[in-house]
Amino acid sequence: MAGREGHFRLIAGLGNPGSKYAGTRHNAGFWLVDELVRRYGGELREEPKFRGDCARVLIDGYDCRLVKPMTYMNHSGQAVGALANFFKIPPEAILVAHDEIDLPPGSVRLKRGGGHGGHNGLRHIQSTLGTPDFARLRLGVGHPGHKDQVVPHVLSRPSPDELRQLERAIDDAADQIPRLLAGEWDRACQQLHA
């Protein structure tokens, strides 16, 4: 598969493997990767050396690798780091899609670099890469209201209304991936943050 090198060469969607976690808010990043595979005709394959399910797709002529780490959220950096090292992908060319409790359900925000905000998947990726200089695609799943309820909240399934909002957000995010690969960050932000 030959394609142009896009601004982002690796898109990682974070989540937890296994049927116990399928459909939970914490797996929003997995859902985005699944949507990109569906849209662009890829096939996710288990890649033990990369610690995840991986696909390679052409998106508007841009060659892009997708990964769903199968290491559980707290060790997501193992998959992202392995792919980045093997394919010589710098942190600036990595986009990480993840659930975000500080955004309401259905909202999407792009962010370059920054802290992990308490998100263990981001924390591990940042530690593995040795830098926070990767981009994030934040998929809002809402906050439960109290910090003691955060873990049960993200590890549970959204309500039917929240699920519809989250699915719409994932569609909106997937619509902007070609722009992001083309380096049109500001335009994608305008569309998603409006």
Swiss-Prot record:
Site, as annotated: Stabilizes the basic form of H active site to accept a proton: D99
Protein family (similarity comment): Belongs to the PTH family.
InterPro entries, per database record: Pept_tRNA_hydro, Pept_tRNA_hydro_CS, Pept_tRNA_hydro_sf
Protein name: Peptidyl-tRNA hydrolase
Summary of subunit composition and partner proteins: Monomer.
Site residues, Discriminates between blocked and unblocked aminoacyl-tRNA: N16
Residue numbers binding tRNA: Y21, Y72, N74, N120
Native source organism of the sequence: Halorhodospira halophila (strain DSM 244 / SL1) (Ectothiorhodospira halophila (strain DSM 244 / SL1))
A GO term, aspect molecular function: peptidyl-tRNA hydrolase activity
Reactions catalysed: an N-acyl-L-alpha-aminoacyl-tRNA + H2O = an N-acyl-L-amino acid + a tRNA + H(+)
HAMAP family: Pept_tRNA_hydro_bact
Gene it is expressed from: pth
GO CC annotations on file: cytoplasm
Location of the active site: H26 (proton acceptor)
Class in the EC hierarchy, top level: hydrolase
